Amino acid sequence: MLKTAFSIPFWQEQMPNFNLHRDSMIDAVYEFRDLFPQGEYKSNHAGYQSPKNLHHNQKFQSLFDFINLVAVESARQINLDGNIVLSEAWANIHDSRQCMNHMHIHGGVFSGCFYLKVPNKAGRILFSNPGLNPMWQGLGLVKQPNQYTAESTHYLPPEG
């Protein structure tokens, strides 16, 4: 389903038959952590972030097949020609209340997240408006924030 946030396309999809694959993918993430315990640091604070080659692991084939289908359809919906290539994928494990991702940018690319498991009272994912200039704050240019002028928007992360 196509949504917009600040006039930027935003898709939210559910993986078919997710519950059939969920537990095996969660186990595979922990196996990946056991194989690569040092992980990588990009944006994850106090949690684990795997190396960025998770999409080459056969245990996630069903997930990345689904992601590729969504990416191709998303590109078609916005009339984007060319080949869609999944270049990086990694897993984050947030296993304590101190874990979080720092705000970061995936510029000039499609990017996404997929939640295998979401605890009760989990935090929300935040999207910040790249079109706003911080120097405009306080000038009263926007009386009522809307999807094009709000500073940020939040989505509760669903599993699957």
Indicate residue ranges for each PLM-predicted region.
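Catalytic core of non-heme Fe(II) oxygenases with the double-stranded beta-helix
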Residues: A91, D95-G160
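Short, charged low-complexity linear motifs
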Residues: D34, S87-W90
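Sequence-level motif detector for i,i+2 pairs with an aromatic at +2
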Residues: S7-F10, L86, A122-G123
